[in-house]
From Swiss-Prot:
It catalyses: XMP + L-glutamine + ATP + H2O = GMP + L-glutamate + AMP + diphosphate + 2 H(+). Keywords: ATP-binding, Glutamine amidotransferase, GMP biosynthesis, Ligase, Nucleotide-binding, Purine biosynthesis. ATP binds at residues 231-237. Residues 7-203 form the Glutamine amidotransferase type-1 domain. The active site is at residues 84, 177, 179. Its EC number is 6.3.5.2. Residues 204-391 form the GMPS ATP-PPase domain. Gene3D superfamilies: 3.30.300.10, 3.40.50.880, HUPs. NCBIfam families: guaA_Cterm, guaA_Nterm, PRK00074.1. Pathway: Purine metabolism; GMP biosynthesis; GMP from XMP (L-Gln route): step 1/1. It comes from the Bacteria. One of its GO terms (molecular function) is GMP synthase activity. This is GMP synthase [glutamine-hydrolyzing].
Amino acid sequence: MATSLQSVIVLDFGSQYTQLIARRIREIGIYSEIFPYHTKAETIRAHQPKAIILSGGPNSVYDEKAFMPDPEVFSLGVPVLGICYGLQAIAKHFGGNVESSSKQEFGRAKMLVNHDESESLLFRDIPDSDVWMSHGDKVTQLPEGFRVTASTANAEVCAIESFGSKAALKVYGLQFHPEVQHSLYGKQLLSNFLIDIAGITPDWSPKSFIQHQIEEIKRVAGDSTVVCGISGGVDSTVAAVLVSKAIGDKLHCVFVDNGLLRKDEAVKVMEFLKPLGLNISLVDASDLFLGRLKGVASPEKKRKIIGRTFIQVFEKNIHDEKFLVQGTLYPDVIESVSVKGPSETIKSHHNVGGLPKRMKLKLIEPLRELFKDEVRAVGRELGIAEDILMRHPFPGPGLAVRVLGSLTRERLDVLRDADQIFIDELKSSGLYSKVWQAFSVLLPVQSVGVMGDKRTYENVLALRAVESTDGMTADWAHLPHDFLAKVSNRIINEVRGINRVVYDISSKPPATIEWE
């Protein structure tokens, strides 16, 4: 990111909330990055952060192979805030003691701020309030030069900070999770740490991001031509518009119709992308894809066939382009870096691992620093219509992973018709924008039914709708029963070949959002 931005580094110890910490910081208007906990201090110093945050984690600091930060992190001259496991790592590093607690805390707890001590900048304007706990260990002995600034009924040491001879270190620790919404003053507390203690001036915004990216794209691409595979989804659309702002008609977008799109998708996508002024070529390769997928039931084989065929089609539509635009997001980048150590195998994300090396295309990933909600905010700043920005995520393999079992044109058409009814009803009921993602799945089973006094033996369709903020975790959407009944009745009566509709009430984890 631009060196002029003041940034915060979050060291990840494996917490499920690490990304949430980074997002909360950005909501305050400050740029944040996530690094593995084992990142060396000299690497951190090179990024010139104004503050460092140690995340929570699932382990115990007294384990033989406990995750610990580079000790020199505390000598970089910037404020450090430890959250949950991060607090315990601080206590251990400075000579305190951490033990397993006989009274674990999970969920809401009442935090009592220690008003007897001289005012803590961290707790300025923060009263006694509910906080979110998730820990089984506790600090039983404070390190020398630290004081307790808050407690709960089960955690005498709920918050600590350096003082006296160690005050200049500006090291703070919280046993609770300020990044979680259930911690009522959590965002205010983070703001106190970043602005009042670290002295950071908020300068991160969609507008500043766009300005920097346009400059960077111009610098990287120069006079070269650039190609972008566009799908009509949020990520590829925002990425394409952003690159187009930088290099104009030197960007060539390719939209491949693989025959696995939603009903009338190709026509709709071309229509709503037209006002954006992008140079787009529509390639109809549906016969090629469906021919190769005919009769294939294995989801892994489907993905491999689709991936290989897409590469071949895409390659034929590339001319003298030197760069490839991809809509890689920050969670994709984070998932590719292990917190377990530098010796662990790095996972190659699907966005960057598929195109053959012989194409010799260099990557431009203008969104790789953004979370999904930030992509939408950037899209709004770019003037992209809300209908495009709020489209639900759609898997790369398309309907191939929503038609379970053998893939045929007929089964795809059945799914398209049913899914269109589901989505139309969500929109007309004002529910579409209230769920993260909604879709239909055609199951590889049939069931007995009765229609018009005749016995039927036809397909079962599953409806899936989930609520989420980033797709990393998700809960099933509690749609009204009357709404589900209406959708079910319409599908059974209007879509030939379906006689039973079910609703998926699984959350992620343990289930995934998609069925395949």
